[in-house]
């Protein structure tokens, strides 16, 4: 990939089998990390958004991808690699990855998960409140804000699923 092209490259792996998904993710992470280490240049920044982070950097067990993600979490920012990980529960992700996250966003938590040390950045009252969050409500923590911030994403004014769409007349019909 030409990383200097200043483009967004989305690699959709959802149709691949589990082994193939791990292979593709591992190959991309290795390539990005090796390129950044070789050049020593922070710019251009490389942003990696990885869903189901617990699958690639699990708390328990070892894997080459896990070690690469731990390395990126520990040294990535200084190399210009930004890792954005998404997962259902932070307690299932490698501790080194969670501890090195500078920005944390959490949605609704169940009672057992809320008491885990991974959520120690939240005030006890916020942890209790997070158990009752409705869909779209989140807590944001980042170093520039002195206390965690609770916010709600607005409901989108358009259909997000095909079954929600309403078949209307074409508003532009008859215009030339």
Residue ranges and their predicted role:
Residues 150-176:
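Charge-patterned, long linear interaction tracts outside catalytic cores
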Residues 65-157:
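Conserved ATP-driven motor cores of ASCE-family P-loop NTPases powering translocation/secretion/packaging/pilus
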Residues 1-74, 78, 138-144:
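P-loop NTPase motor domains
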Residues 16-18, 55-57, 90, 158-163:
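Short acidic, S/G/P-rich loop/turn micro-motifs used as interaction or catalytic elements
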Residues 1-4, 8, 12-14, 94, ...:
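Poly-acidic low-complexity segments
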Residues 26, 59, 136, 156-158, ...:
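Generic signature of intrinsically disordered, low-complexity segments enriched in small/polar residues
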Residues 31, 37, 52, 60, ...:
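Glutamate identity and glutamate-enriched acidic tracts
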């Amino acid at each position: 990939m030409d990383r200097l092209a200043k483009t967004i490259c989305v690699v959709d792996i959802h149709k691949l089998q589990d082994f193939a998904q791990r292979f593709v993710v591992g190959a991309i992470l290795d390539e990005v990390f090796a390129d950044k280490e070789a050049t020593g240049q922070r710019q251009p920044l490389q942003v990696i958004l990885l869903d189901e982070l617990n699958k690639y950097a699990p708390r328990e067990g070892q894997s080459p991808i896990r070690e690469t993600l731990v390395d990126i979490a520990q040294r990535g920012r200084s190399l210009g690699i930004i890792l954005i990980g998404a997962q259902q529960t932070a307690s299932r992700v490698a501790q080194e990855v969670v501890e090195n996250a500078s920005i944390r966003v959490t949605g609704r938590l169940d009672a057992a998960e809320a008491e885990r040390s991974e959520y120690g950045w939240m005030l006890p009252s916020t942890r209790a409140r997070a158990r009752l969050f409705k869909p779209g409500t989140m807590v944001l923590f980042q170093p520039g804000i002195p206390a965690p911030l609770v916010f709600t994403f607005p409901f989108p004014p358009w259909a997000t699923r095909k079954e929600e769409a309403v078949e209307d007349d074409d508003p532009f019909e008859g215009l030339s």
